[in-house]
């Protein structure tokens, strides 16, 4: 009999909702007393989210979705300097609406003898701690990124108590962040920390982390032993549970994905030799300038490897590609729009991944043993790239501090060199490390593994009874 409920509040984007759903599935799989309610807020530019939720709702029988009503007064994205400040504003405005829904849930479930044991919120939804306080519910954070990011946030809260200035872009400052082995260049910090309103939003979030009952990170001891161990030894910080990697192995199709084209891509991959194809994909939010598209195309011609390049129509015009490029690479390369990334990374033909270093993409590539070339674009991806290259030695460096709106040109020769290195199957230290980590993290999520045990501990701490 199921008698325990958790209320999940994710940031309303597909990239955040997917790991939340998968974490819900893992919890229920490990303890069938648990059921989950997910509250869905509305965010500008995420109209396809409803389609996605409908596509997966039927496959999650113990998860229910409740839509939070739309805000009457909506902030506009252009009214702030940073996306992070805009999202923080949206979440704060949703607090009264969410409070009402949670109160209704508590009342209705109490009639059925079901206890709500806590709120589990996303990083940007930390302001929802006000709801938990008002009704005396435990408050947990599911951080869909890594432990290194959490260490940076812990450092930020501490620094702000001594120095309230924003970080200076393009400075040579090196930061000593507990939880990192190496000094961290300020240049790889999240973009928001270089502008006033973004910095303010991050500081508020960093302080709210310290008030949680516990923090779950989408990483594992095997991936980040130094950082995870740092938090295990912390006495004055909430409990940290390394429960990852968490992602959707079955990967529901994106609402904008052309399924016929998907079949063509997979058939093409089936015809390629093992580990012979480099996959290039820069996430759903990056927009590459025409000059960069040209450099990537030249780099792919120079390196001579087979390639699959995810390049959406809105990113490119015919003039952006070098004249005759498509004819010269015919048979050796493919360009597609939306791509089934998990299926592609799982395919035996794929031997390398040029990535924007979003954490979802990183854990997918590690799971399938595909080494990454780092080309961060926005948000915290520069920190992820630094973590992967310098801290963990699990990626090949193309760029660590590139930002999508900068004027920096990454030239074809740099791209060629990085691709050649990542695709080299002989004496490639990074490839060997990634293959080893792949086996370790797959074991970690099974019974007896470190991530499985971390979820068990979380369940025990929440419910008070072992699964």
Swiss-Prot record:
It catalyses: a flavonol + UDP-alpha-D-glucose = a flavonol 3-O-beta-D-glucoside + UDP + H(+). An anthocyanidin binds at residues 16, 379. UDP-alpha-D-glucose binds at residues 144, 341, 356, 359-361, 364, 380-381. InterPro entries: UDP-glycosyltransf_plant (IPR050481), UDP_glucos_trans (IPR002213), UDP_glycos_trans_CS (IPR035595). Gene3D superfamilies: Glycogen Phosphorylase B. CDD domains: GT1_Gtf-like (cd03784). Keywords: Glycosyltransferase, Transferase. Possesses quercetin 3-O-glucosyltransferase activity in vitro. This is UDP-glycosyltransferase 71D1. It comes from Arabidopsis thaliana (Mouse-ear cress).
